Amino acid sequence: MYPRSRVVGPGLGTSSSSRDHAGAGQHGELDLQQNQRQNLEVAEPKGPKLERQGHGDQRSTGTYTLIAPNETRRQKIQRIAEQELADLERWKQQNKAKPVHLVPQRLGGSQSEAEVRQKQQLQQMRSKYQQKLKRDEAIRIRKDAEEAELQRMKAIQREKSNKLEKKKQLQEDIRRATLREHHQSKTAELLSRLDTDRTNRSACNIAPPAAQSSRWKLPVLLRDPSRAGSQAHKDSPQKEDNQKLQKTRDGHQKNKLLETKGQHQEEERAQIHQAEHWRVNNAFLDRLQGKSQPGGVEQSGGCWNMNSTDGWGI
């Protein structure tokens, strides 16, 4: 094994220990030079191979390889570092805190201590009422918001109900129009049938004399049961239609009579109510007139209102 020894190449300068302890400069340098010589002497018998490696910037001594520093690069790095330090110092000088210049003033405000304490006491006394006012204001704001929301919902529901009402009204109008058309068509059909029956009946009534004479001559043909049944079958729809028309007319007349009777009753009721109102007013005015007179009821001999319908005697 190679002996362990401290080796410092030429140009590396002092080691880290020499930088930390600058007081032991010469003694440390002598020790380093002696150790370097011993290492070189030990490395010489190794042969020509180590001599070839020692040429140039690299030099191998035992287990260590010494590399000489690049002076140009080192100087460049140092120059850049110095420039940056100078820039930093310049920036610090430019951006250092400036002195503050304030106008001197009297501290403590323009009020005395007694006034301040009195103001604090008043604020303390009013704080309870101020908190109550704040709570009331918050409650009022919340109620206003709730009322606005309720009104908005009511408006929405009202709009929905209006739309539904319009839809129902439209359906009702369509239904009434359909019913009216159906009624008109049925009425026209009934009238056309009645006109047809009337024309047929008039044609039957206006028969030729030969037919009438044959009827008198051939009474057996008129008494034929098959012809009688067919004639009855033809007359039955006409009778039903006539009955329906008669019932409809009777219903209209009855409704008109009921409406007229109701109007008369309403007029009589209104007249009775008006007469009663007049009677009560006259009685009240008579009582007021009797109270305003000096003798009152005694001067009138017990009959204080002979003209009014509400008069009475003692």
Curated annotation (Swiss-Prot):
Positions with biased composition (Basic and acidic residues): 43-58, 232-267
Region (Disordered): 1-72, 200-219, 225-267, 292-314
InterPro entries xrefs: EPSTI1
Keywords: Coiled coil
Coiled coil region boundaries: 71-180
Comp. bias regions, Polar residues: 305-314
GO biological process: cellular response to lipopolysaccharide; cellular response to type II interferon; gene expression; homeostasis of number of cells within a tissue; inflammatory response; macrophage activation; macrophage differentiation; protein localization
Function: Plays a role in M1 macrophage polarization and is required for the proper regulation of gene expression during M1 versus M2 macrophage differentiation. Might play a role in RELA/p65 and STAT1 phosphorylation and nuclear localization upon activation of macrophages.
PANTHER family from the UniProt entry: EPITHELIAL-STROMAL INTERACTION PROTEIN 1
Protein name: Epithelial-stromal interaction protein 1
